[in-house]
Amino acid sequence: MITRFAPSPTGLIHLGNARTALIAYFAARSSGGEFILRIDDTDVTRIKSEYVNKIFTDLSWLGIKEDLCIKQSERCELYANAVVKLKESGRIYPCYETPEELEIERRSLLARALPPVYRRKNRPQHSTRLPYYRFELDPDRVVIWEDKLRGKIVIDLHSTSDPIVIRENGTYTYMLPSVVDDIECRISTIIRGEDHISNTAVQIQMFEALGCTEIPKFAHMPLLKLQTGKMSKRAGGNEIQTFRENYIEPEVICLYLLNLGSKSRSTFKNYKDYSNFNLENYSSSSSVTVLEDEIYSLNADFLRLSNYEDLARRLGGVSKTFWDAVKNNVKSIPEVNYWWEICTTEAKLYPGIGCNAQLVRDAISVLPQEEVSRETYRRWVELIVENYRYDKREVHINLRLALTGKVGGPEMAAILPFISRERILIRLNDSLS
């Protein structure tokens, strides 16, 4: 199987793009095939070079390694050859209408209760205007294909306009170059969102017009949506870059997206085993909702299940004993580093805010003489409760505030052994000043 992922560098890759890339990548690898990355950069008015670089960064971060990378901007000669062939066969024709004239025609058709469809007619040449070009569809032919996820799909193109393939400025639209590249790269399976179903019907006619005898198989995935609505580059907030900057692990994004909408459930241990992957396990339901809270929760699970040795390089000087003490109560690696700094250095705290000063004084009066361990911390809390009649929860909250400057975090009994008794006493007194 040869698959491809074809992002357009007009924005950052979001979760929906990444899911398509991952599924196409795993489909290729599970079959022993090839995965091709194609940069769709023909629309010079919208693309930005910075987004090209970020596509590579995001895919590399996700562990996606292409077998071949092509850029459409470097393949225009191939497209020009295809255009010559289609002109010779009469399937591409010039048009001269301005956008304003097309809008007038559209309104006229609607006013007569007719579909606003652009078809080839005896359209006059225009001596002073540059032409743009359309591909002539066969409107009387119903396009049928067997989708790998949705089964039989039937599209009637009677109400579809002939698509524009070359703009007035000579640049290509998405439709034709995509087909030319799929033929030239021998793509066997095209995996993409369900919003491309109508494009597929049009492109099947393009494949045929170019003499392609082995048209790729298609798998149209349900679109991802957020709880707040549709996912898109324009809406933002769900980009891979954003999750990376928020310290979500790449394994978490991969596992979450690969499991989303699938009948089978992979784990961190086995999701990279390509032999477990089956494209047909994915649902063809109309949409799949992304719950960002689940991603952050899954990140915490990943850290909890990770071995110290696997993360040691990224943990800096954090000791294994500290990692084991806090890993069940943190959601990101920077959070581990943060708590390590609080516990082992003279970190700048603001512990006095919100503390019960009398409780802190009472806590100082019964602070054990030995270095604090899990057991001595529990005994210390019990002494404060028994001697001064405080609620145990209140004691925990105030000790946490005084000693860490925070209202939440890892279990106090787990982290206090990493704060020396001397530092504990200093912080308790500082919280009173």
Swiss-Prot record:
- Can you cite an annotated GO cellular component? cytoplasm
Task: Enumerate the catalysed reactions.
Answer: tRNA(Glu) + L-glutamate + ATP = L-glutamyl-tRNA(Glu) + AMP + diphosphate
Q: What is its main location?
A: cytoplasm
Q: What is its EC number?
A: 6.1.1.17
One GO MF annotation is:
tRNA binding
Residues that bind ATP: 233
Q: Name one GO biological process term.
A: glutamyl-tRNA aminoacylation
Q: Where is this motif: 'KMSKS' region?
A: 230-234
Q: Where is this motif: 'HIGH' region?
A: 7-17
SUPFAM superfamilies found in the cross-reference section: An anticodon-binding domain of class I aminoacyl-tRNA synthetases, Nucleotidylyl transferase
Q: Where in the cell is it found?
A: Cytoplasm
Q: Which UniProt keywords apply?
A: Aminoacyl-tRNA synthetase, ATP-binding, Cytoplasm, Ligase, Nucleotide-binding, Protein biosynthesis
Q: Which family does it belong to?
A: Belongs to the class-I aminoacyl-tRNA synthetase family. Glutamate--tRNA ligase type 1 subfamily.
Tell me, in a sentence or two, what this protein's role is.
Answer: Catalyzes the attachment of glutamate to tRNA(Glu) in a two-step reaction: glutamate is first activated by ATP to form Glu-AMP and then transferred to the acceptor end of tRNA(Glu).
Query: Subunit details for this protein?
Result: Monomer.
Q: What is this protein called?
A: Glutamate--tRNA ligase 1
Which source organism? Neorickettsia sennetsu (strain ATCC VR-367 / Miyayama) (Ehrlichia sennetsu)
Q: Which gene encodes it?
A: gltX1
